[in-house]
């Protein structure tokens, strides 16, 4: 596979926590062979007997877990999901550019499974993975905790450099209006009153009951409808 490279295994300088020999690596269901798994603080690496292998950066690892499914042909193993693309180098050209573009919109996911010959080592492998992963938090998770809204600077206010937002009740707001503002408010209220009361002029008839209902809080007018006025209307039940 094209992504397999030759590199020195991580050592104590990289914070090596666990070295597990005789561990089979499986990529998306395809076996890569048996080698040694290195769980270090800097990266997760696997090398086969010939010195070829791969390394995974922790920020790209979205999930790691222990699989206890004994019905799986691999048996118990360490499962690792990576948000990156690892595959054999394809020799076939892409037939459709549109199909290639659609693949770019989907985040690539690769599944690795590490199967040690010594199943009792799985717990220690998982614990080491947890410790190393905690050293590399997801930057997106940190950004989501940031508040994008405008914040009130308490310290600046204590130093006399900030303003406290002012809130008024309805009555307090009226007292802060200028004479011109009060006149404008009265004019708007009058227009609103005329607009609402005009809704009670059915067929050109305005009754005292409709005015009283409006003044009492917009009650429903139960006055019988003039016979024949809406007989031709279609009603959906």
Curated annotation (Swiss-Prot):
Instruction: State the compartments where it is located.
Output: Cytoplasm, Cytosol; Nucleus; Cytoplasm, Cytoskeleton
Tell me the residues on which Phosphothreonine occurs: 223
Give start-end positions of Acidic residues composition bias. 139-153
Any one cellular-component term (Gene Ontology)? methylosome
Query: What GO MF annotations does this protein's record show?
Result: RNA binding
Give yes or no: UniProt keyword Acetylation.
yes
Determine if Cytoplasm is one of this entry's keywords.
yes
Q: Where is it mainly found?
A: cytoplasm
Q: Which GO terms describe its biological process?
A: cell volume homeostasis; chloride transport; mRNA cis splicing, via spliceosome; positive regulation of mRNA splicing, via spliceosome; spliceosomal snRNP assembly
**UniProt keyword list:** Acetylation, Cytoplasm, Cytoskeleton, mRNA processing, mRNA splicing, Nucleus, Phosphoprotein
Q: Which residues carry this modification: Phosphoserine?
A: 102, 144, 193, 195, 198, 210
In this UniProt entry, the residues modified to N-acetylserine are: 2
Q: Where is this region: Disordered?
A: 135-159
Regarding protein family, the annotation reads: Belongs to the pICln (TC 1.A.47) family.
Record function comment: Involved in both the assembly of spliceosomal snRNPs and the methylation of Sm proteins. Chaperone that regulates the assembly of spliceosomal U1, U2, U4 and U5 small nuclear ribonucleoproteins (snRNPs), the building blocks of the spliceosome, and thereby plays an important role in the splicing of cellular pre-mRNAs. Most spliceosomal snRNPs contain a common set of Sm proteins SNRPB, SNRPD1, SNRPD2, SNRPD3, SNRPE, SNRPF and SNRPG that assemble in a heptameric protein ring on the Sm site of the small nuclear RNA to form the core snRNP (Sm core).
Entries under PANTHER family matching the protein: CHLORIDE CONDUCTANCE REGULATORY PROTEIN ICLN, METHYLOSOME SUBUNIT PICLN
Known partners and oligomeric status: Component of the methylosome, a 20S complex containing at least PRMT5/SKB1, WDR77/MEP50 and CLNS1A/pICln. May mediate SNRPD1 and SNRPD3 methylation. Forms a 6S pICln-Sm complex composed of CLNS1A/pICln, SNRPD1, SNRPD2, SNRPE, SNRPF and SNRPG; ring-like structure where CLNS1A/pICln mimics additional Sm proteins and which is unable to assemble into the core snRNP. Interacts with LSM10 and LSM11.
Identification of the protein by name? Methylosome subunit pICln
UniProt source species: Homo sapiens (Human)
Q: Which gene encodes it?
A: CLNS1A
């Amino acid at each position: 596979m094209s992504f397999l490279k030759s590199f020195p295994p991580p050592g104590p300088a990289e914070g090596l926590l666990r070295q597990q020999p005789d561990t089979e690596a499986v990529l998306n269901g395809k076996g890569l062979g048996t080698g040694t798994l290195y769980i270090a603080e800097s990266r997760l690496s696997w090398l086969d007997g010939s010195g070829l292998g791969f390394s995974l950066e922790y920020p790209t690892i979205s999930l790691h877990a222990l699989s206890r499914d004994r019905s799986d042909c691999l048996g118990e193993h360490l499962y690792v999901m990576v948000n990156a693309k690892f595959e054999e180098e394809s020799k076939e050209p892409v037939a459709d550019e549109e199909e290639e573009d659609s693949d770019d919109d989907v985040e690539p996911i690769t599944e690795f499974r590490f199967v040690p010959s010594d199943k009792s080592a799985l717990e220690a492998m998982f614990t080491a993975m947890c410790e190393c992963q905690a050293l590399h938090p997801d930057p997106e998770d940190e950004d989501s905790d940031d508040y994008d809204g405008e914040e009130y600077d308490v310290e600046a206010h204590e130093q006399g450099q900030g303003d406290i937002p002012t809130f008024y009740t309805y009555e307090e707001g009226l007292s802060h209006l200028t004479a011109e503002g009060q006149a404008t408010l009265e004019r708007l209220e009058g227009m609103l009153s005329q607009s609402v009361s005009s809704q009670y002029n059915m067929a050109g008839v305005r009754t005292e009951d409709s005015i009283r209902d409006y003044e009492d809080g917009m009650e429903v007018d139960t006055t019988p409808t003039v016979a024949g006025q809406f007989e031709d209307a279609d009603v959906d039940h």
